[in-house]
């Protein structure tokens, strides 16, 4: 007994010194969910923006007080809020796994929602819960309703593909001999009666867009074969000695020859019309020409005489080419020798006498050989004495 009490004493001491509180019980969870649902507009709803943080904290403290009324330990408002956040997060994660678990052969047992989770779905609303809001039966019903929608889309695609295949087989002679053309016969592989009903209801609407290409494509296929056979049957019976025409596009050759002949006839008619028009035009001109002013005998007035040629210009003697002689510069210095003016270059200007008879001039003295060019200065003019080196201008 002493040992048992001694063993129990340390355990009680450990329990009293234990800091971690026990998990929330079922009753505590029920109180938490009920109180959060009652105060949800103040905590998370539209009114939460107008509620201060202190007021929300007081709401959580009041919820914790109600939970502490049924337990021997005390929980704070922060612990209660954390428990609600964890509860909500786990429920959302479980809801996110629902579509993946319902795609198999049957519903998974571990994903069945409890009453608490269903209540949380109702609190959070359809925006968060999605198709699983409400009870578990509604969840399974929503999952079952999502499957027929997907199956309906696949069934419609299947019916369209089968209808196209049926139309192709109907064009072939093997299909025309025997076979059912009803869409129900192609829908037999489906084992779901609901899908069969939906396919029967949607098959007329699906047949309309499919029949259009069949009606558009069916005439070209059977149309080309009959003309060659008809020509082949008529060609031997024709009494014409010409050999049978080749079966490759006979109608095109006939149409081409016919069009060519029509074109030639049209050209001939146009040429005849042009000839008639020209003949009528010539007759009209021949009738109108005599009425024009002019001699009646002449069909056309004579051409006007050409203008007279211009009078010939007087012939002038050829003018001698004008040669300009550069005048030699003559220095101003001149001397008077025996009544005659002698220039620097030796030109003698004889003075006229009073009677107008020129006087004989004596021969001019010979000029020195070392005479400088006329453009150079003579010694008689004073020049500036240059000293030093020449400076560039």
From Swiss-Prot:
Residues 375-393 have a biased composition (Basic residues). InterPro entries: Myb-related_repressor, Myb_DNA-bind_5, SANT/Myb. SMART domains: SANT (SM00717). Changing residue 281 to P: Reduction in homodimerization. The keyword Transcription applies. Residues 1-11, 142-157 have a biased composition (Low complexity). Gene3D superfamilies: Homeodomain-like. Pfam families: Myb_DNA-bind_5 (PF13873). GO terms for biological process: negative regulation of transcription by RNA polymerase II; regulation of transcription by RNA polymerase II. Residues 16-88 form the Myb-like domain. It is found in: Nucleus. One of its GO terms (molecular function) is DNA-binding transcription repressor activity, RNA polymerase II-specific. A motif (Nuclear localization signal) lies at residues 87-90, 376-379, 384-387. Changing residue 274 to A: Reduction in homodimerization. Abolishes homodimerization. Its main location: nucleus. Residues 160-171 have a biased composition (Basic and acidic residues). It comes from the Eukaryota. One of its GO terms (cellular component) is nucleus. Residues 219-229, 238-247, 296-320, 359-368 have a biased composition (Pro residues). The proline-rich region is required for PFN1 interaction. Transcriptional repressor; DNA-binding protein that specifically recognizes the core sequence 5'-YAAC[GT]G-3'. Dimerization with PFN1 reduces its DNA-binding capacity. Interacts with PFN1. Homodimer and heterodimer with PFN1. This is Myb-related transcription factor, partner of profilin. The gene is Mypop.
């Amino acid at each position: 007994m002493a040992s048992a009490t001694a063993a129990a004493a340390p355990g009680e001491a450990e329990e009293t010194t234990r800091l971690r509180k026990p998990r929330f019980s079922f009753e505590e969870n029920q109180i938490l969910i009920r109180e959060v649902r009652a105060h949800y507009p103040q905590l998370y709803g539209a009114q939460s923006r107008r509620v201060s943080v202190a007021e929300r904290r007081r709401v959580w403290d009041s919820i914790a007080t109600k939970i502490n009324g049924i337990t021997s330990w005390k929980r704070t408002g922060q612990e209660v809020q954390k428990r609600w956040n964890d509860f909500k997060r786990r429920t959302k994660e479980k809801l996110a796994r629902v579509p993946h678990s319902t795609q198999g052969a049957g519903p998974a047992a571990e994903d069945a929602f409890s009453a608490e989770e269903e209540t949380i779905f109702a609190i959070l609303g359809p925006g968060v819960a999605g198709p699983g809001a409400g009870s578990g039966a509604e969840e399974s019903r929503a999952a079952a309703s999502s499957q027929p929608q997907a199956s309906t889309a696949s069934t419609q695609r299947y019916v369209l593909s089968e209808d196209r295949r049926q139309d192709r087989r109907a064009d072939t002679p093997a299909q025309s001999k025997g076979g059912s053309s009803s869409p129900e016969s192609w829908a037999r592989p489906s084992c779901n009666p609901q899908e069969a009903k939906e396919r029967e209801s949607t098959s007329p609407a699906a047949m309309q867009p499919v029949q259009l290409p069949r009606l558009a494509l069916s005439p070209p296929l059977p149309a080309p074969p009959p003309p060659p056979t008809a020509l082949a049957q008529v060609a031997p019976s024709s009494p014409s000695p010409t050999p049978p025409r080749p079966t490759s596009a006979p109608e095109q050759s006939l149409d081409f020859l016919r069009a060519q002949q029509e074109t030639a006839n049209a050209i001939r008619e146009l040429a005849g019309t042009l000839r008639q028009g020209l003949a009528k035009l010539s007759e009209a001109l021949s009738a109108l020409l005599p009425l024009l002013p002019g001699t009646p005998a002449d069909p056309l007035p004579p051409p006007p005489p050409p203008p007279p040629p211009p009078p010939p210009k007087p012939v002038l003697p050829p003018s001698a080419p004008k040669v300009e002689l550069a005048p030699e510069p003559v220095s101003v210095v001149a001397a008077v020798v025996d009544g005659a003016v002698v220039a620097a270059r030796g030109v003698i200007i004889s003075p006229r006498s009073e009677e107008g008879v020129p006087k004989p001039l004596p021969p001019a003295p010979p000029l020195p050989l070392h005479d400088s060019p006329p453009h150079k200065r003579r010694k008689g003019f004073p020049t500036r004495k240059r000293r030093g080196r020449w400076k560039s201008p």
